[in-house]
Each structure stands twice: as C-alpha cells, then as structure tokens.
C-alpha cells in the first residue's frame, strides 16, 4: 500500500526582515518533535520569504505614475497599489473593475502581480513576491542540508486562481532539489495504450496538498514537511519554476479568449 504523510509545523514565529528562515524551519521542526529526513519535501508559503527578504512595502512610500492613476480609475484600486503592481509587472493583460491581471517580472500570469496584504501587519503594508523564488528555494535547501546533513527539496508556494474554475489553488513559484514533472509520455497504461501528453506538474500537486495544512487565514502553519514521495518524484539540482510557464502559442486558454 502506497502512502505519504504531511506535517504542518505549529508554533512558527512571526518572521521579521533579515530572519534566518532555514535555521528557524529546522528549529521549529525539532520543537514539533520532528527531525528532517532524507527525501523530505519542504513546502514553504512565499510570505515567509517576502518578509525575511524585506519585500514588504508601505503604500505611504509609493508615488503613483500617470499610468497607475489611469488604471486606478478603471479598476477602482488605490493608485499607489496599482503603481506597486506595475513595478512588479512586464505586461498588463486585463484591467477592469477590481481586476488587474498581469504577467509579472518572474513570468507568472496572476492578479495584482501576486501582491497582497494577508497576514501582513499594518493596514497599508503589502507583501511583494520574492525577487527570485527559485534562488530563495535553493538558498533555503542548501542551508537546511548544511544544518541537518539531510538531502531535501524545497518548494515555495503561493495561491492563484485558475481559468474557468472557481476557487484558488496553491502552486509552486520557486523550487530546488526536485524535478518539476512526472513524465508519463511514451509509457503505457493498464490496457497497453501509449500515453502521449501526460506530463504531470508534480511540484504544483505537492504545493496544493501542503495548502490543506497551510491554509489561508490564521492557521499560522507556513511550512509543511511532505514525507514518503521518494518513489514518485525525482531529485534534480537545476530545475526552475519557469519550466512550468508555457508560451503564448502553446496556451490553449489564451487562444479561446
């Protein structure tokens, strides 16, 4: 019988700018009576890194541009907030009432460039995504391996909407030490049919599973340890979450819209 387990780390302190996230993760694991083991996949909510990496900005420090003021009238959003989104974006894809859909500087297509204020202290303080989530994941993984002597993977996750589906789901936005995909193409199913398109984004599936414990409100569980997936995922040193992003030509939804 196959199985895996997920441990949501309780008692995690509020992260401050400059905090040593890997050291805190290892310490909280031990406080929970849990030792990190080889092949563990450590899923971390992006807000942890945003705080530690000083990616929290105050609206009072932001001066909106003409473009931000114009889009503010269209969206009904604070022009200073719109300016933050523009600074983090490559392209504005859609602007309408309460909606600002962009392609951000990391290549993610998302609402408000992933900027929000959930679990951020201060009414006008907002969290930006980590500057380079893959780099953050790699630094975290290497530090944890140095502290514990164990070979692990790290996934940084955030929550996004999906085309034509209600509700949001956790996705991987930064990865290190794990192959992003479980590729079934060329293999055969139970009846001998050759699989031609099955290439599962396993890091997104792991991120979604972890979100069941991380939650979105006051759960205060920003880190989940996933154990028992060594038969399902492959170790990979050089993976990047950019591999999950498809080109406009490949994007079926863009073609429909």
Model-derived regions: residue spans:
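N-terminal and secondary-structure boundary signal
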Residues: 1-257
């Amino acid at each position: 019988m196959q199985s895996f387990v997920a441990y949501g780390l309780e008692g995690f302190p509020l992260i401050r700018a400059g905090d040593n996230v890997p050291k805190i993760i290892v310490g909280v694991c031990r406080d929970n009576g849990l030792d990190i083991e080889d092949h563990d996949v450590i899923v971390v909510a992006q807000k942890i890194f945003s705080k530690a990496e000083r990616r929290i900005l105050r609206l009072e420090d932001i001066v909106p541009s003409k473009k931000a003021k114009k889009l503010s009238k269209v969206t009904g959003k604070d022009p200073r907030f719109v300016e933050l989104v523009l600074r983090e974006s490559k392209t504005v894809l859609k602007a309408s009432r309460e909606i600002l859909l962009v392609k951000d500087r990391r290549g993610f297509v998302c609402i408000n460039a992933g900027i929000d204020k959930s679990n951020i202290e201060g009414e006008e303080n907002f969290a930006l995504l980590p500057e380079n989530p893959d780099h953050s994941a790699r630094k975290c993984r290497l530090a944890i391996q140095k502290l514990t002597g164990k070979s692990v993977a790290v996934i940084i996750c955030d929550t996004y909407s999906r085309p034509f589906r209600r509700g949001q789901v956790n996705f991987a936005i930064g990865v290190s030490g794990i192959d992003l995909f479980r590729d079934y193409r060329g293999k055969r199913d139970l009846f001998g049919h050759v699989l031609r398109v099955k290439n599962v984004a396993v890091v997104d599936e792991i991120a979604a599973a972890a979100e069941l414990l991380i939650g979105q409100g006051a759960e205060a569980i920003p880190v989940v340890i996933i154990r028992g997936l060594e038969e399902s995922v492959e170790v990979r040193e050089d993976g990047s979450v950019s591999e999950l992003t498809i080109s406009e030509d490949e994007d079926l939804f863009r073609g429909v819209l």
